[in-house]
Every structure is written in C-alpha cells, then in structure tokens.
Amino acid sequence: MAVKASGRFVPPSAFAAGTGKMFTGAYAWNAPREAVGRERPLTRDEMRQMQGVLSTINRLPYFLRSLFTSRYDYIRRNKSPVHGFYFLTSTFQRRLWPRIERVNQRHEMNTDASLLFLAERDHYARLPGMNDKELKKFAARISSQLFMMYEELSDAWVDAHGEKESLFTDEAQAHLYGHVAGAARAFNISPLYWKKYRKGQMTTRQAYSAIARLFNDEWWTHQLKGQRMRWHETLLIAVGEVNKDRSPYASKHAIRDVRARRQANLEFLKSCDLENRETGERIDLISKVMGSISNPEIRRMELMNTIAGIERYAAAEGDVGMFITLTAPSKYHPTRQVGKGESKTVQLNHGWNDEAFNPKDAQRYLCHIWSLMRTAFKDNDLQVYGLRVVEPHHDGTPHWHMMLFCNPRQRNQIIEIMRRYALKEDGDERGAARNRFQAKHLNQGGAAGYIAKYISKNIDGYALDGQLDNDTGRPLKDTAAAVTAWASTWRIPQFKTVGLPTMGAYRELRKLPRGVSIADEFDERVEAARAAADSGDFALYISAQGGANVPRDCQTVRVARSPSDEVNEYEEEVERVVGIYAPHLGARHIHITRTTDWRIVPKVPVVEPLTLKSGIAAPRSPVNNCGKLTGGDTSLPAPTPSEHAAAVLNLVDDGVIEWNEPEVVRALRGALKYDMRTPNRQQRNGSPLKPHEIAPSARLTRSERLQITRIRVDLAQNGIRPQRWELEALARGATVNYDGKKFTYPVADEWPGFSTVMEWT
C-alpha cells in the first residue's frame, strides 16, 4: 500500500567542502594520466614562416643567435614544435626583432656623412660580433684608405695652387681636415677639433694632430673596440638580457669582460716598476697604485670624508640639505615593472622601441637638464653645492642621487626650478610626477649616513652585509661588481662634486711634508688650506679655499701644470701636474710637489746563481768537502740549457774535460735548440730540400709605425711628399734618395742577423 506524502520532504545532506586536491583513488595507479593523443603538426604555411624566422636568426651575431636557437630547441624538445613555432613568431619576430632592428639602425654606418666607405658597410654591420683579429684588420683598412685620400687631396691642392709650400697653411690644412675627418664620421665618431673646424677656427697644428690620429691603426682599433662593446651591450639590453630577472645593471658578458680587462691591467702593473730617471732607483708600481685613489677602498674613504666635510661646512654656514633623485622619462627605459612587492614582474617597454636609447643617451639627457637647472640658478642668483652620485636602474638606465645644500630661504625656489625642468619632457606621462623627480629634506647630521649606502654600492659594497637592493632584491654587497662593470662599459663617471673647490688641489696639498708650513713661501691663506688638507678636514679646506661656489680663478690654491719634455705619438705637448700655485700671488709663483721624474719600466728579471747540476761523483782526493745536501727545504734552481752550456765551456777552457766527450756535445746541442727562435707557419720555408731559415716579419712593428709619423713631418718640412712604401722603407732603416739628397733614420734592429740597411733612389 503506497504511503502518500503529506507535503514534507527530507532535506538533502550538507555539501562537503572540497579539499583542493584531485581525487586519486585508494592506490597510486588510480591517479589520472595525461590524455593520449597526437600533437597537431605544423601546416605548410607555418613551416615556411618558421624557416623564414630561423633564417633571420641565423644572420644575427653568434652571441644573439646562440641565445635564440638554444631557447627554441629547448621549447621544441620539452613542449612541442607548435610551441616552438609560437616562440619564433610571437616572442621573437613580433616583440624582439623590431627592437634589434632599431638598435642596428642607430649604430649602422652614417652614409649621410660620407660615401667613401660604402663598400665597408656590410662589414661594419658585423662589428658587434667581430673578434679582435678581424677588428684590427678592419681598423688598418680604414686608416690606409684615409691616408690615400689625404695624399690625393694634397696632390690636388698642389696642382691648384702651384707650390708645395701652400700645403703648410691654415687654409690648406683645414681643407684637407674637412674632407678626411668628414669621411671618418661615417663610422659614428667625432674627430678631434671637429667643432673648431665647423666654427672656422682650425689651425695647422690642430689639423695635423687630428689627422695623425685618423692615420693611426691603434687609434682606430681603440675606437672600434669601444663601439663594439656598447653596440653589443645595447643589443643584449634590447632582447631583455639586462634586468633584475636575468642580469641586473650589466650583462654577464660585460661583467666578465670588465673583470678580464682589470685582471690583465693588474698583471701588467705587477710586471712593471717605477724608475727614477736621474738616479735609476726603482720601486714597485703596484704598491703605488694600490696606495692611491685607484684602490676602491681608498676612493671610498676619500668620498666619505668629503661628504662629512661638506655636511660640517653646511652646518657652520647655516645651510639646509636636500636629497634629490632625478630619473629619465620612460622612453629611455627598455623595460618596466608590473605588480607590487614580491609579485613584481619585468616586461618589455614598447615605448623604448621607437628610439632604442642606451644608458649613454639617458646620461646625456640628465646632463642636459642639469645644465638648464644651473643656468636657471644663475639667472635667479641661487647657489647650491654638494655631491652627485650616478647609479643604474636594474635595466641599466642611469638615474642621479644628489645631496645638495643651500640657503634655507632659497630651498623652495630651487626645488620648484628643478621639478619644472625634470618634468619638461614627457611630464604628463603616467607616474612622471611621482618617479621622475623626488626631493627630501635632510636632517642635520644625517646626510652622510643617507648617501653612504649609494657610495658603497657603487664602489666595493663595504658595510652592506645583510642589506638588499631595492631594484633587484639581491644583496647590495653582490651588486657592486655589476655596477662598476656598468660604469666602465658606458664610460659614465659615478661621482662628481657640485660647487666645491677642486679635489686636485686638495690631493696635491696632501703630498706636501706633514706639519711643514709654507706660509713663508706663500701667505697665511695658502697655509690654512695646506693645514686643512694635511689634517683631512674637508670643511676647513672649503673655507680656506674661499667657500662654496667660488670661481676657480678666485680660489686660494690651484694645481700648477707645465708642458712635459716629451711629446706624444702625435707630436703634441703633454701637460703634467708639477705642483700648486696661488692665483692671488701670481701664476708664476709655483711650489713643486712632484720633484722626482719617474717613468714606467718593465721589471728586471731575477737571475738565479749559476749552478751546474750533476750527480755525486767519486772525489779526486781522500777528503770530500762537497757533501750532498741533507735535510731542510732548500732546493737548488734548475739551470737553463744556456747556463749549463756556459758552465761546460768554462770546464773545457780549464782543461777539466775534453771537447769530444759526450756530455759536452749534449750540453752544446741543448743550448743551441733552446736559443733557436721558433718560426711560425708563415715564416717557414716550404721547400723540403732547403734549410728552414727564419725570415723577418713583413709587418711594421709598433716603433716603426710611430716612426712613420715623425718621418712624414720631417720630410714635409723639406718640401717632400713621400709615398706610403717610401715611408715604410725609411721606418725600417732604409736610405732614400730625393733629388740627390739622402734621407735615413735610425731604427732598432729587432731581427738580429738580418740587414735592414737598404738604399733606394
């Protein structure tokens, strides 16, 4: 019998909250597995598109090509060919390739300046991936073509004016310089004295110095290496290899390159001495370098002492401090950060793609707006002084931290001027008011501690244990190497004083004997500056120099310089620091602080005492006074084959042994093999029937290349314009006959045994 419900139902059971874990069953084999299915193959159009992108990648320099091909192979192997296709078409072709193209366009040959090197355009485009050997050959081709151009222009000028003497005028040299230097500008360089040439102020002496550089292979090598390094780094910035997630501040390649160059420089310094030109006294060069501000520890201590002195001087004058931060617009930043706190992620900034600015461009922008600010300060009779620190963002874009002091009544006006110029360009973009300019008031006594972290971070990471970097989240102590590599790569000075007396005079005053007054030689004002520098009190030094914002000509003490007796390889006088002088007492009243003339020379190799190595033999007499050494750690140095042969010859001369003994023959044969120069493959004789003799190298040595410049000047003074092969022959020691007059120049014989004396008519 059915039971009728009276309108009441049992409610369902409560819903069980999920645990968040997928049901796996009672046993491990009950866990769900991936669905079995075939991966979608690439279509014919996709394959064709993928091959085109891979062909584009294959034309990139190796350091970029290997980066993308390895990433593509990893995705294709661990995911699927479809995912690899999406990486090539979406990530590379759509997002990265336009940035790479824009960087290459900014660095390509400037054909608007000259079409002389149009044939080298493709070769110049390979500069970021060029090795040193190929780069040196490229530099030699550039200098030789410019030399040929100069010769042709000189001949044309003589034909037009009729006399060779007309070449040695300002007008002629300016004409030649304009064509040669204009052609060199195709390689994105600024030749020396180019601005003076554009203003019509070029002299013969200046033209010669500038043109001599353009003919120098080593000068071009140095220029091209700098361009290669910056081009290489900009490409890595463009593809996102320089940021807090990859390598902050500088790429891994730049850090390794700077470390290798510094290690090579250190090894060179260890291999050299400082020699007194008069007495021949020698001291270790590396010890002097490590005792100067080249030592990061000493540099940091000097900067901290400078900051403390500035703060004490400001407190004595009643000035107030400001901590200013200046940042470039967003278009100078290759990346941007999205999110907050630990969830921040780095994304490419597509606003950067239009211009592809590098850190050097951002530094120029900051210097430009700072010059506008200083002009506004001068127009409104405002004065500031302090210290500027330049450091990079995580993506390599520089920003400035400035510790400035001023009169309390001028502070608001100064801040408003700086804010106006900081936001003058793209000031309406999102976040500009908050990020582009920041000004904080400094409490008395807190300035040094506030900026000390930035100084240590940019030098050696001293006393930063346990502190994290705001940009990268990494320990500040570990970022110092990357920051210094960034500054070295982009040639950006990290520290600069503002409105303060010169640091050069401060360092020269500290070279004077401690506690020895110079008031009798100068006056009490100069003595006060010396005493302040001697005690390391930078605040008193500022006061003794006349205070902050005093023009250099009005300062109490300045650095004295004089031309050196020697000229450089471009026949230019080189000024060197010799001491100090007081402008108010006359520029000729100089106190010499550098009384000794030193030069850098290689270390003298340590010659071990001659020891003839032999076994213990039977004594010639009943008493053997030359027993075998026993005990101790003393070890006799092994003689070279030449030293061993010399000792054997002495024994032969004394009649102890005979010429025909086997030991003598072996010793002399070993010495001959040891002293024989090993020829390289190009110098070996290919004929098996002829003896293998060493031929001198056909390349010019460094001393011969330097001699060519001096020979050209000497012959030009005699009205002679030699050809290139004649200059090379004269540099090698040949005698050349010009119209019955013989010319020859001394040269070091770097290939003994081969005559370098020739005569050409």
UniProtKB/Swiss-Prot annotation:
Record-level GO BP terms: DNA replication; viral DNA genome replication
Catalytic residues of the enzyme: Y450, Y454
EC number(s) stated in the UniProt entry for this protein: 3.1.-.-
Disulphide bond pairs: none
UniProt keyword Metal-binding present: no
InterPro entries the UniProt entry points to: Replication_gene_A-like (IPR008766)
Keywords, ordered alphabetically: Covalent protein-DNA linkage, DNA replication, Early protein, Endonuclease, Hydrolase, Nuclease, Viral DNA replication
GO MF term set: endonuclease activity
Domain of life: Viruses
Pfam hit, one: Phage_GPA
Keyword Nuclease belongs to the record: yes
Family: Belongs to the phage GPA family.
Protein purpose: Endonuclease which induces a single-strand cut at or near ori. May act by forming a covalent link to the 5'side of the nick.
Protein's name in the database: Replication gene A protein
Taxonomic source organism: Escherichia phage P2 (Bacteriophage P2)
Taxonomic classification: Viruses, Duplodnaviria, Heunggongvirae, Uroviricota, Caudoviricetes
Gene from which this protein is expressed: A
